[in-house]
Swiss-Prot record:
The chain crosses the membrane at residues 16-36, 158-178. Keywords: Glycoprotein, Ion channel, Ion transport, Membrane, Transmembrane, Transmembrane helix, Transport. Interacts with KCNMA1 tetramer. There are probably 4 molecules of KCMNB1 per KCNMA1 tetramer. One of its GO terms (cellular component) is voltage-gated potassium channel complex. GO terms for biological process: detection of calcium ion. Regulatory subunit of the calcium activated potassium KCNMA1 (maxiK) channel. Modulates the calcium sensitivity and gating kinetics of KCNMA1, thereby contributing to KCNMA1 channel diversity. Increases the apparent Ca(2+)/voltage sensitivity of the KCNMA1 channel. It also modifies KCNMA1 channel kinetics and alters its pharmacological properties. It slows down the activation and the deactivation kinetics of the channel. Acts as a negative regulator of smooth muscle contraction by enhancing the calcium sensitivity to KCNMA1. It is found in: Membrane. Residues 37-157 are extracellular. GO terms for molecular function: calcium-activated potassium channel activity; potassium channel regulator activity. Glycans are attached at N80, N142. This is Calcium-activated potassium channel subunit beta-1. InterPro entries: K_chnl_Ca-activ_BK_bsu.
Length: 191
């Protein structure tokens, strides 16, 4: 009976060690993926200064000629604000600025024009309700763009690192508990 118990303990310890090592390896892989995708975006984000923006004007632009380019077939919202003592164009996120420099807000669903138009109207109405709001600006002097919301801020980075850290801690805890259990069983066998 005693030998079967020892063998069962050994098998359980091996499985627990494998689980702990697998958790640590998954955490390392997740850290690598986050380090190569999220971290460069966070470091590249220059909109770090939280400012107060005052709404100047909002326009909904349909298909019209802007700087020699045709705006795509969706309505886009153009928002001008006053931030940090200067005039600026407000963009919803970093990605909005990269997708189309002529739109402050691009609606989520572009398939149905009427739904997109209603979405843009709703956002425009919210800006007119609350004409003073927080935005993110850069410390550069000649920059004339500000962001309403940062995609790659410190909170996003911390939230992304939470689960890999949880996985790493859990894996290390399992490995430590197995090793402590093994050393205690060796001490008990010696007595």
């Amino acid at each position: 009976m005693g030998k079967k118990l020892v063998m069962a303990q050994k098998r359980g310890e091996t499985r627990a060690l494998c689980l702990g090592v697998a958790m640590v390896m998954c955490a390392v892989i997740a850290y690598y993926i986050l380090g190569t995708t999220m971290l460069p975006l966070y470091q590249k984000s220059v909109w770090t200064q939280k400012s107060t923006c005052h709404l100047i004007e909002t326009n909904i632009r349909e298909q019209e000629e802007l700087e020699g380019k045709k705006v795509p077939q969706y309505p886009c919202l153009w928002v001008n604000v006053s931030a940090v003592g200067r005039w600026a164009v407000l963009y919803h996120t970093e990605d909005t600025r990269d997708q189309n420099h002529q739109c402050s807000y691009i609606p989520g669903s572009l398939e149905n024009y009427q739904v997109a138009r209603a979405d843009v109207e709703k956002v425009k109405a919210k800006f007119h309700e609350q004409q003073i709001f927080y935005c993110f600006s850069t410390t550069r002097e000649n920059e004339t763009t500000v962001l309403y919301r940062r995609l790659y801020g410190p909170q996003t980075l911390l939230f992304s690192l939470f689960w890999p850290t949880f996985l790493l801690t859990g894996g290390l805890l399992i490995i430590a508990m197995v090793k402590i259990n093994q050393s205690l069983s060796i001490l008990a066998a010696q007595r």
